[in-house]
């Protein structure tokens, strides 16, 4: 098994965490991106840098030579994901990204499922805090249930200082849906113009009850129903964190002191099952999620091939427990 893992967008905020995590896990990060100056800055720390652009397939092919896997950390994923998946398929290597964009993740399943399966490779979109972690928690909470009526994923963030990449990706998604909102109900994605409700969510102690925005839809509405029979998938965001999205963007920074709790409830008939994860810094925790995914793919610890969400391709409880250095878990 090769140890070289290409990271596209390596010099971005999440990308830097991914590079550090790869190195911590004994992998050799190959730094990919189109900004030569920023690549050179990271390469000065002893990494190999390869300039590549999603507009130039040849540059991507050259950049992936010798790589065992590709992690895409560069948004907007509506722009970067497809060219990079194409390059990964040509190179015959697995692809993992940290996309939170709902439409970009849906595109992965719609456009690449058959080709990735035919190639015998694995494409894992949304392998990050939004989309990946929630899917793993829902899958773990389901346990031996083969179906459920509803899955609820509530995000309790102490704050949310968005990166520039988060804001740009959000703008791209907003334009794609023409400013409308999206939810997963009745077994399908539905676009609407309804006002978002505010309600109280009973997060576990020590967080306790908090005001949340209902139907604050995240990538879980793509990942969860991609493999689980759950016709209603609803996500919620703490009202304070939602208001922070309008705050000025910080520059490059280290690990944030902001904390999070992800509270998952799965309901079937009159029964409810719950799984909870708590931790610190939603961007930093995306790195061990993505790198653990790559490690499991490269070591053959997968359950399927093709385009698959975290909960579909990995043993969800085992995966979550492997991140005990980064997450505190309940009900897993």
Task: Give the role of each language-model region.
Residues 5-25:
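N-terminal Rossmann NAD(P)H-binding glycine-rich loop of SDR-like oxidoreductase domains
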Residues 8, 143-274, 284:
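Active-site-lining helix/loop region of Rossmann-like oxidoreductase modules
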Residues 77-180:
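Glycine-/Pro-rich loop/turn segments that contact NAD(P) or position catalytic residues
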Residues 32-36, 53-54:
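N-terminal Rossmann-fold cofactor-binding loop
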Residues 4, 68-69, 94, 273:
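Structural motif
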Residues 30-31, 96:
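Conserved beta-strand positions in the Rossmann-like core of class I SAM-dependent methyltransferases
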Residues 51-67, 73-79:
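Conserved Rossmann-fold cofactor-binding substructure of NAD(P)-dependent oxidoreductases
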Residues 241-332:
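C-terminal active-site/capping subdomain that shapes the small-molecule cofactor and substrate pocket
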């Amino acid at each position: 098994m090769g140890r070289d893992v290409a990271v596209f967008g390596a010099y971005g905020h999440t990308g830097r965490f991914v590079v550090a995590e790869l190195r911590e896990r004994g992998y050799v990060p190959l730094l990919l991106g189109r900004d030569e100056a920023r690549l050179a800055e990271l390469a000065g720390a002893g990494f190999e840098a390869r300039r590549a652009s999603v507009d130039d397939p040849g540059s991507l092919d050259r950049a992936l030579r010798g790589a065992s896997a590709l992690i895409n950390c560069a948004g907007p994923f509506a722009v970067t994901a497809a060219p990079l998946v194409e390059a990964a398929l040509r190179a015959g290597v697995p692809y993992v990204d940290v996309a939170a964009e709902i439409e970009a993740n849906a595109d992965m399943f719609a456009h690449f499922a058959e080709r990735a399966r035919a190639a015998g490779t694995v494409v894992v979109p949304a392998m990050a805090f939004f989309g990946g972690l929630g899917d793993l928690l829902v899958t773990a909470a389901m346990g031996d249930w083969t179906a459920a009526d509803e899955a609820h994923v509530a995000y309790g963030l102490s704050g949310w200082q968005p990166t520039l990449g988060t804001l740009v990706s959000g703008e791209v998604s907003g334009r794609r849906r023409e400013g409308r909102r999206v939810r997963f109900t009745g077994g399908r994605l539905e676009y609407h113009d309804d006002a978002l409700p505010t309600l109280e969510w009973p997060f576990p102690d020590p967080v306790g009850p908090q005001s949340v925005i209902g139907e604050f839809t995240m990538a879980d509405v793509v990942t969860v129903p991609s493999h689980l029979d759950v016709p209603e998938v609803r996500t919620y965001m703490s009202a304070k964190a939602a208001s922070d999205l309008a705050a000025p963007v910080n520059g490059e920074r280290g690990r944030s002191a902001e904390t999070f709790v992800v509270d998952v409830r799965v309901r079937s008939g009159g029964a409810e099952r719950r799984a909870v994860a708590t931790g610190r810094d939603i961007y930093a925790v995306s790195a061990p999620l993505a790198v653990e995914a790559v490690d499991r793919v490269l070591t053959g610890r997968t359950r399927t091939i093709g385009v698959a969400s975290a909960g579909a391709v990995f043993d969800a409880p085992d995966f979550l427990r492997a991140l005990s250095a980064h997450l505190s878990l309940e009900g897993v």
